[in-house]
């Protein structure tokens, strides 16, 4: 977040990531100037269009999540995807775009598209792990209810607390045990060294 406000910021931060072992970087939005600067440095770039969750938190809170449902938005996304490909994008992430619009984008690009809530016509799919595992309280239309880890975690934490409060945990089976003879040696050493046992 806020690591690519200018082309210089983008290059500086992306270079650090690549030096640390990243194979590529990703940024949100239709920003050919940022893409040009990164590609000039030989950095592989994945672009992310549609919903830009790092920059649109307030709109998301108001419930406006899908992008491309109106002609002007759909046209901007289709043209933006083509523009980013022309500037060297290696992959396009399409987030919360209507399935039919994602199909048009995918069919008009020569690079892979990865959808997150963008329908079945993308070349691949991705979900946020917290959504996939049901860890977040908020549920999203594009993510099936595979499992409710949130409820499982709440149950586990409540049990953990009850067992601590009730003196059940930790039990002897959870403790590391020292040999009696070795412990006597520790006690003798403590006495000789001024430690209370």
Task: For every predicted segment, state its role.
Residues 1-197:
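Alpha/beta enzyme core
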């Amino acid at each position: 977040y806020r690591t690519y406000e200018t082309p210089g910021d983008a290059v500086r931060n992306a270079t650090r990531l690549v030096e640390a072992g990243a194979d590529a970087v990703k940024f949100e939005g239709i920003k050919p100037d940022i893409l040009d600067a990164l590609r000039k440095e030989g950095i592989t770039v994945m672009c992310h269009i549609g919903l830009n969750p790092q920059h649109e938190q307030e709109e998301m809170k108001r419930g406006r999540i899908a992008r491309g449902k109106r002609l002007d938005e759909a046209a901007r996304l289709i043209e933006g995807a083509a523009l980013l490909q022309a500037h060297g994008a290696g992959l396009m992430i399409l987030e919360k775009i209507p399935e039919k619009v994602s199909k048009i984008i995918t069919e008009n690009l020569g690079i892979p598209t990865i959808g997150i809530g963008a329908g079945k016509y993308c070349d691949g799919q991705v979900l946020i792990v917290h959504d996939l595992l049901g860890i977040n309280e908020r549920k999203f239309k594009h993510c099936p209810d595979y499992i409710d880890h949130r409820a499982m975690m709440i149950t586990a934490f409540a049990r953990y607390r009850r067992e601590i409060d009730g003196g059940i945990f930790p039990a002897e089976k959870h403790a590391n045990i020292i040999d009696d003879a070795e412990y006597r040696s520790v006690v003798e050493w403590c006495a000789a060294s001024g430690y209370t046992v």
